């Protein structure tokens, strides 16, 4: 099997996507296709479109929120780092202590994030300026965000989803393989907020998942 003949034996957190290429060439190829920007549709496509220009009412609805400054429809995972770096939301910090946003904004952009959370601690990772992590967050969303690098099983690499389950009295480690296929996406593709002065990433799910539940929360 491939696990008995791996060319790159990976231990622990591995953020470098290219190290998975030799052992998982087909999966790596499909990942590289997220770099494409060749179609637009009613449901976004893969081209960055200025959503505020298309829907100017969102500037008013998002007033006081960073998305009122700039929001483009998302491109593929391979563009995650360059797109957030170019966004007006993050500004142009000239030093690690400047800029309008916390490093929490990096959370879903790179497999380097779990590496830095392990090195610094989750609280310390969030409680920094966005610019402070720029030299470390260099690999775009990829393999180890959703797969355990040692076993390639689906896994949750971001703490906010695990914590949201815990506050509901649920154990995410009991999720079925079928549920994990959704949950690996749910750790990032969700509504969230940055809690308190520490800008701790939090999902407002304590009372449920609907808009009304979140408003009640």
Q: What do these predicted regions represent?
A:
Residues 64, 74-78, 82, 98-101, ...:
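Non-catalytic propeptide/linker segments at domain boundaries
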